[in-house]
Amino acid sequence: LNERIPYTSGPQFLAEQVLQYRHVLAVAGTHGKTTTTTMLAWILHYAGIDAGFLIGGVPLVDTQDERLQQAFAHSSYLGSDKTANHEGYFVIEADEYDSAFFDKRSKFVHYRPTTAILNNLEYDHADIFPNLAAIQTQFHHMVRMIPSNGKIIMPADTESLEETLKKGCWTPIWRTAIASTNPHADWQAKLVKQDGSQYEVMFDDHTGQVNWQMS
């Protein structure tokens, strides 16, 4: 500070140097961010999409596929920029903790996602947030930066998230639920096996079956 050397926060640097021209898929929420981010990045790579990612933990990879082993050997991967086949996707664990000692905004405010997955929203980080409303304000700031041609994906019947969206949102929303708890959600899941390794996914009039070995 005394030498007036230019500095920036990690989230701002990431946004300006990596995310600016990517289709950012941000996974936010109080719980489950690391797991959901890993699952989303894995699904994209399994589908042949060379998505970049930043995960808040090193993934445990159980595969013989060398391509997947290399990509998931660390918690971050740059991925490919936009190509003829797909946008340059980047999956990021979007943390609500503050950005730096000089920038008390949540990290995810910098990321400007096109798609946001909001897992849940509860009171957390009592060292920097006085109450749930303060966290909701930060989520509101992120939501307002998601474009109208983007998407918000969130669980149905989550009061704290619904309250946040009522403050202002111009992005289409997909609500998800287990079919037995909310048959009116946009996306529904129905367990076929109780351990979660096999389930059905319903959207509109379409049904797909998922066989998932990472339950």
What are these regions (language model features)?
Residues 1-154, 160-171:
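Phosphate-binding loop of NTP-binding sites
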